[in-house]
């Protein structure tokens, strides 16, 4: 069959599968028209299979959804939106790359939408209802989007990672099977993953990130920050704001933290250095070491299965409540009660409540 005949047949096939959504004014990108510029086989060279641009200044939102691939969004572009679609074979089907014909055949099982809806850019790839799953023919459809800085997003994938960077506005993103990499965002930031780690850096305003299956690394954050994981460690560096960071399955480490910190773990130790402000820290399965450079409104540190060691300024007025198998603290200008296992009273006239507790270990204050 000639190339012209093959292309005509493919056009006819695609027309049968296009979804017409006039009421929603969704601009559907007829894939054959894009292919006419030169459809290509996909490999690790990372050339997009489909690429489309949208330049209207009224476009302020981005919606991306795919069931089997990764999503990457980068803001800061000056010439509107560019959407690239990538098609790859899944790792378990024994192929590293697909030919043009193979891609066209496998895309028959998907509804692909790339276009606009009101003030939104929409890019989705969904399996058609009723299609049978075939591991040998399964593919991963991913999207890379380049967007202006001031754009709100709603991103969702069930089978890949999400990378999002250089945006201002409300950002919502979730994946069931990959990691989150978040950088240079300002606004309401809400991200979830059920199967990967989180790496977040240089973000501000309101940050809410959670994973059920990986570690969290956070650096250069400012604002109201909430980080939670059920299955990994937490590392905090250069954080400023109201911070909540908890894990059920790993350690907590941090350096250069200011503001208010509420952190804890059920499965590891806590190590914090250069902390300035109010702190609540706890562990059920390890020791706690904290270096405070400046006291805030309170200090509340506890361990159920290890020792507590705190280095902090001793010249402020404090109300001390320390208890453990052994308590060691240099006391000056103190009025209260001192025993081997506890210290209670006022230091320097009283003031900031300082509560240190080790149920199965000692408490040391330097």
Go through each PLM region and give its residues.
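Intrinsically disordered, low-complexity terminal regions
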Residues: 2-366
């Amino acid at each position: 069959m000639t190339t012209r005949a093959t292309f005509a047949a493919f056009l006819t096939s695609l027309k049968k599968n296009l979804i017409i959504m006039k009421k929603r004014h969704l601009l559907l990108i007829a894939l054959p028209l894009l292919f006419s510029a030169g459809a290509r086989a996909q490999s690790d060279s990372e050339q997009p299979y489909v690429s489309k641009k949208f330049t209207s200044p009224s476009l302020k939102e981005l919606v991306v959804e795919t069931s089997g691939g990764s999503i990457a969004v980068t803001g800061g572009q000056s010439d509107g939106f560019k959407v690239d679609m990538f098609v790859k074979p899944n790792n378990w089907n024994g192929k590293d790359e697909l030919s043009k014909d193979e891609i066209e055949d496998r895309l028959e099982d998907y509804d692909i939408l790339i276009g606009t809806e009101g003030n939104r850019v929409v890019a989705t790839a969904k399996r058609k209802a009723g299609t049978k799953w075939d591991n040998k023919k399964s593919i991963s459809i991913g999207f890379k989007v380049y967007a202006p800085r001031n754009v709100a997003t709603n991103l969702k994938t069930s089978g890949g990672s999400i990378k999002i960077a250089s945006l201002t506005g409300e950002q919502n993103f979730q994946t069931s099977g990959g990691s989150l990499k978040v950088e240079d965002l300002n606004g309401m930031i809400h991200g979830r993953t059920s199967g990967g780690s989180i790496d977040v850096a240089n973000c501000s305003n309101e940050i809410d990130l959670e994973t059920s299956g990986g570690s969290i690394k956070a650096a250069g954050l400012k604002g109201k920050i909430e980080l939670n994981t059920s299955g990994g460690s937490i590392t905090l560096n250069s954080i400023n704001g109201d911070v909540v960071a908890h894990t059920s399955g790993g350690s907590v480490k941090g350096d250069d933290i200011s503001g208010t910190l509420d952190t804890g773990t059920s499965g590891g130790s806590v190590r914090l250095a250069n902390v300035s402000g109010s702190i609540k820290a706890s562990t059920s399965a390890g020791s706690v070491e904290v270096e405070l450079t400046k006291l805030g409104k309170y200090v509340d540190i506890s361990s159920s299965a290890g020792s507590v060691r705190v280095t902090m300024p001793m010249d402020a007025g404090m109300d001390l409540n320390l208890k453990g198998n052994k308590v060691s603290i240099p006391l000056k200008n103190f009025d209260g009660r001192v025993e081997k296992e506890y210290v209670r009273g006022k230091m320097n006239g009283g003031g900031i409540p300082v509560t240190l507790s080790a149920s199965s270990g000692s408490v040391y204050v330097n």
